[in-house]
Each structure stands twice: as structure tokens, then as C-alpha cells.
Design a protein with these regions (language model features):
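Conserved acidic donor-binding segment of nucleotide-sugar-dependent glycosyltransferases
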Residues: 324-325, 329-336, 345-350
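Aromatic "clamp/platform" in nucleotide-sugar-dependent glycosyltransferases that forms part
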Residues: 292
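Short hydrophobic beta-strand element within catalytic cores of glycosyltransferases
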Residues: 309-312
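Acceptor-binding helix/loop patch of EC 2.4 sugar-transfer enzymes
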Residues: 40-57, 105-141, 182, 186-187, ...
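Nucleotide-activated donor-binding/catalytic signature segment of Leloir-type glycosyltransferases, i.e.
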Residues: 241, 248-275
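Conserved donor-binding/catalytic core segment of Leloir-type glycosyltransferases
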Residues: 195-217, 222-227, 238
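Carbohydrate-associated surface elements
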Residues: 159, 178
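A short, well-ordered alpha-helix in the C-terminal region of glycosyltransferases
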Residues: 345, 352-367, 373
Length: 386
């Protein structure tokens, strides 16, 4: 969206984020690296003391993040840039002072998730993050402030929208996530090569994106990995970091306990360039989506767009895209799974799942195609702005 807006005559677009990537740029878009709190390490240490409960720690970090973001944006103002429109998320505190900085701007708020009292029934308790009551209420308060600061609001699935109170829900529009289906597309005679890892689509390959290495290491999938590789003697498992802040070092250390003959079939890859990531999806025999919380992950749509066989948790957001046995497969969210049995069953049916691959690609191409949806999203913003 940023690149498309920048391509329109007369527009100047800034993309502000706490994370910077030297290997990635957007045509016509100026990148702004948001400051993190200067005293972040000291702050984290001080607010991690037993004297502060979880709620106080969350409040403090939200304030520090909002203050650091405001400091960065004041630099933008000092350079003479006064935005007509700002698109922002308020759930972690970055948007706390945006309305104060840009009182005349049209603010568009991204509504990601609102914790409800009956969340246990709307989202299986065992799959919820370990967030006690006070931090949940704090995150809801940040969402509420963002809601009243902004002029219009959007989210990416009906399921997310339904979590908000009725009085807020009616003001939130659903703008579905879109994928570059020309870039994320099946490639015949696919080959993946990155560093020392070289794989082809002829091999049996299970791929998985890692959001939290510690959580994965302690979970059933990692513990069952030796059993899976023992049952599938030609299978390779590739784990990809979802960001430069997600380190796989702890997994590398833990892997030392695995039988030496198996370690060569476990590939731990740090954050990949877009092209390499796409090539990996194209050779994947099965892409496993794990540790998905509230939202519909882009990786699910990207994998389906590449024609992957996808195994994903049965959540409300995922069900809006994936139908079990039609264009992918669902597993019960929050339950302890027999990963060896489940993955083996799908790998054994690999040659029978061509229709699943075609349907996955067809679903994303028809409902989440960037060329179709992005002009609609921009038209929505321009209409609300006018």
C-alpha cells in the first residue's frame, strides 16, 4: 500500500517502523526508523522487579514506546513534513501521542485484537497467550484510545472485527490481507539454495516459520522432531526465523542432543530475503503454521499462493480462508498433537494432493490478490479521507 500510494502523483509517503532492513526498500517510499527507548535495557530491568505487577510493566513499556515513537516523529515534523493521513496501530503504545503531534491529520487505525471477558469460549483458552487480566485490560485500553483518536478503522478478518464491543464494531471495516500472487507463485522444477542449504521439490520437505524459538523448543513439535525424521528417512525439516529479532541459537544448541545422523536434515535459517523465502515455499511438501495467535498470518496466504499444502490451526481467522480437506488442512487449535502421525499421513499422500495445491492457489488468487484488493483498499482510504 505504501508503494502504491507513493506512485500516485503529488504524494510523499513515509514508512515508520522500529525495525530496519538493509536488504529491503519500497519504491518512492522514505523509511523512518522509529527510536526505541534510549534507556530500554534499564527500563526493562527496572520494570521486571517483583515490586511491579504485569499490568504496571505493560503500562510502563507502552508509555516508553509511545514516547520514543513521538521523539522520532518530532524529527519528521522538524524537517517540515506534516502528514495529511497517518495509518497506525495502537495496540503496543506506538500511537499514544500521534494525535497530539498531528492534530489536523486524518488518522486511520488498525484494529488487531480486543480481549473479551468470554475470550475462553471465543478462542480456546489453551491457545491464548499467557496474558493475565490486567495486561489484557491495558491492551484493550490502548486499543480504545486508538479508536477514539482515529477517524476511521479497519481490520483484516471478520473474526477480529467480531471481538470488539458492539459500540466499536460498527465503525470497523474489514480490508482483507492481499498477496502479490505474481511473486508468490508456483515454480516448475523448483530449487531452493541459500547458504549451505540446497533442496529441490523432489525431496520431502516440511517447512515452518518460527515466531518464538523458546516456545517452539519447549513444545511438542520440536521434541517429536527426531521421531518424525526417524519415521521419514528422506524428510528434511526447514525452520525459518520470521524476523531478525527472532534468534534460532537456542534451537541450534538444543539440536546437539539429537542423533548426529539426523542433524543434517534439520535446517535452521535466519531471516530470509523475499526471493529465497518464496523459493523455499515453492519446494515445500508441507508448510506447517504454528503459534498463530489472533490474526490471519501473511505466511499462510503466501504459502497457499505458492501452491503449498498447508497445515494450520483451526481458528476463526484461518477458517475464513482455509477449508479442511479442500484447499489445505486444519488441526485442532490448543490441543496437544501427535505431530509425527499427522505429518506422516500428509506426506504419505503427497502425490494425491495436487488438487489441494491448485485449490490453495485458486483461493488466494481469487480472494486475496493484490492487483484486485489493493486498489479497493486505497479507494476506501481516499473515500473516507474525502
Amino acid at each position: 500500500m505504501a508503494a502504491s500510494l507513493a506512485a500516485l502523483p503529488g504524494n510523499e509517503v513515509l514508512f515508520a517502523s522500529e525495525y530496519g532492513r538493509r536488504d529491503f526498500s519500497l519504491p518512492g517510499v522514505k523509511r523512518v526508523l522509529l527510536k526505541k527507548p534510549k534507556d530500554r535495557k534499564k527500563a526493562v530491568a527496572s520494570i521486571s522487579t517483583p515490586a511491579l505487577d504485569a499490568g504496571e510493566r505493560d503500562w510502563t513499556m507502552a508509555y516508553l514506546r509511545g514516547r520514543a515513537t513521538a521523539s522520532s516523529l518530532m524529527g519528521v515534523l522538524a524537517e517540515g513534513f506534516e502528514p495529511d493521513m497517518v495509518i497506525l496501530s495502537g495496540s503496543m503504545g506506538n500511537g499514544l501521542f500521534v494525535r497530539n503531534l498531528f492534530p489536523e491529520a486524518f488518522l486511520v487505525g488498525y484494529a488487531d485484537w480486543y480481549f473479551r471477558d468470554e475470550a475462553e469460549t471465543r478462542y480456546p483458552l489453551s491457545t491464548m497467550p499467557d496474558i493475565p487480566l490486567a495486561p489484557r485490560n491495558i491492551r484493550n485500553t490502548l486499543q480504545a484510545k486508538n479508536f477514539f483518536d482515529c477517524n476511521c478503522h479497519f481490520t483484516t478478518t471478520e473474526w477480529q472485527r467480531e471481538q470488539y464491543p458492539e459500540g466499536m464494531r460498527g465503525f470497523i471495516s474489514v480490508l482483507r490481507k492481499c498477496v502479490d500472487t505474481e511473486f508468490f507463485a508456483p515454480a516448475p522444477a523448483s530449487r531452493f539454495s541459500f547458504g549451505d542449504c540446497e533442496l529441490t521439490e523432489r525431496q520431502e520437505i516440511v517447512t515452518l516459520s518460527v515466531r518464538d524459538a523458546a516456545r517452539l523448543r519447549e513444545g511438542g513439535f520440536w521434541c517429536e522432531l527426531p521421531s518424525l525424521l526417524s519415521a521419514r528417512s528422506d524428510c528434511h525439516v526447514v525452520l525459518i526465523s520470521t524476523g531478525k529479532e527472532v534468534r534460532l541459537d537456542s534451537l541450534r544448541e538444543s539440536m546437539a542432543a539429537f542423533p548426529s545422523g539426523m542433524r543434517g536434515r534439520i535446517h535452521l535459517l535466519d531471516f530470509l530475503p523475499p526471493g529465497a523465502y518464496r523459493d523455499l515455499l515453492c519446494v515445500s511438501s508441507l508448510h506447517l503454521c504454528k503459534d498463530i495467535s489472533f490474526m490471519l498470518p501473511s505466511e499462510l496466504l503466501e504459502a497457499m499462493s505458492c501452491g503449498c499444502v498447508v497445515l494450520a490451526p483451526d481458528t476463526g481467522a484461518v477458517r475464513e480462508v482455509l477449508s479442511d480437506g479442500q484447499n489445505g488442512f486444519l488441526y485442532p487449535s490448543g490441543r496437544r498433537m501427535n505431530w509425527v502421525m499427522l505429518i506422516t499421513l500428509l506426506l504419505e499422500r503427497r502425490s494425491e494432493l495436487l488438487s489441494i495445491r491448485r485449490n490453495a492457489r485458486k483461493t488466494v488468487f481469487g480472494k486475496h490478490n493484490k492487483n484486485t484488493l489493493l486498489p479497493r483498499h486505497i479507494a476506501f482510504l481516499m473515500d473516507r479521507y474525502s
